[in-house]
Amino acid sequence: MSTTNILLLCGGGGDEHAISLLSANYFETSLATLPQFNVLRVELDVNGHYRTAAGESCELNSRRQIRFDADNRAPWEVDFAIPCIHGFPGETGDIQSYFELINLPYFGCKAEASRNCFNKITAKMWFSALNIPNTPYLFLNEMSDVSIEQATNALVNWGSIFVKAASQGSSVGCYRIDNQEDVASTLAQAFTYSDYVIVEKTISARELEVAVYEIDGEIVATVPGEVICSSNNFYTFDEKYAANSKAQTQVVADISKEVSDLIRQYAISAFKGMKLRHLSRIDFFLTDDGEVLLNEINTFPGLTPISMFPKMLQNHGHSFPDYLLSNINSTD
């Protein structure tokens, strides 16, 4: 039986570096059950340096090889890559652009789709273009008196706002503001994470998530799951990933079939319209008035022990190894 050499690239050096390593563990465990694959795990650090799990310095070159610094180690030919990196440079599309440049097949969304989803401003423009309802917002491109005034006016009109770094993970550089005196300092903090900032109306709503993925040539949208935050406020980075998180998750949300079908319809429309590939987690709000709003799309969702994507996939009747095998074999 012929084997395929798979590069499992993780880390990235960004704010979600540690979470990426946990997700890589999940991939590694699943790939270990598939004997047709040889897997080399390589960590990318904040300085752009590559290192194997054994601590060997190496690099991915344009010939689709992992070349080792040690002179006595032969290059490792790469047939396929899994960019298990949350945030930069994975979900931003940067690493995918390099893979495309060197003609290396890879798992996950392509570069342009990744960029469009990761930038919250671009994503919301796409949602509106696809006629998918989303939260009211405005965006700012500099820290200035004008930006402070615009955000303050939004707070007055909407009662409460979220200020979010536009080009960061969903819970990174994200702050709720209820008081006008907090606007300037919070904007300044958000701008340290991104050149652009988005201001959204705070929505009183339930947080629902759908796993949308491809398997055996079909696009699947699971029934929505639900995240219930202990603070009844916001699904923070710590609540999302910490082992002692008090947030509760339900793989199947307690909602009507009508609402579930509508959410799945929107999710499929977003997946197809934005040309996503292989995997995504698409997050929605269900307001107190029963309105469904698309919140955001994660093109490489977390795969930690408490993450929703693998749980929803399994609940839908698919094993993660079979899902990986299907997509690896079907990717050119």
UniProtKB/Swiss-Prot annotation:
Gene3D superfamilies hit by this protein: 3.40.50.20, ATP-grasp fold, A domain, ATP-grasp fold, B domain
Primary localization: cytoplasm
Entry note: cofactor: Binds 2 magnesium or manganese ions per subunit.
Annotated pathway: Cell wall biogenesis; peptidoglycan biosynthesis
Binding site for Mg(2+) 2: 296, 298
Positions contributing to Mg(2+) 1 binding: 283, 296
Organism of derivation: Shewanella piezotolerans (strain WP3 / JCM 13877)
Gene name of the record: ddl
Subcellular location: Cytoplasm
Family: Belongs to the D-alanine--D-alanine ligase family.
Root EC class: ligase
Protein name: D-alanine--D-alanine ligase
